[in-house]
Each structure stands twice: as structure tokens, then as C-alpha cells.
Amino acid sequence: AFQTSFVFQRFYETN
């Protein structure tokens, strides 16, 4: 359950 955090962080940073 770490991929979700990674994707979320990546998406948040990209914003």
C-alpha cells in the first residue's frame, strides 16, 4: 500500500 502514496505525492507535486 505504498504505490498509492507515491502516485498521490507525484500528482500533488505535479499540480
Swiss-Prot record:
Triggers of expression: Hemagglutinating activity is inhibited by polygalacturonic acid.
> What is the organism of origin for this protein?
Vigna unguiculata subsp. sesquipedalis
Q: Which UniProt keywords apply?
A: Hemagglutinin, Lectin
Q: Which family does it belong to?
A: Belongs to the leguminous lectin family.
**Could you tell me one molecular function GO term of this UniProt entry?**
carbohydrate binding
Instruction: State whether keyword Transcription regulation applies.
Output: no
Q: Write the protein's name.
A: Lectin 29 kDa subunit
Q: What does this protein do?
A: Trypsin-stable lectin with hemagglutinating activity. Has mitogenic activity on murine splenocytes. Inhibits HIV-reverse transcriptase.
Complexes and interactors: Heterodimer of a 29 kDa and a 31 kDa subunit.
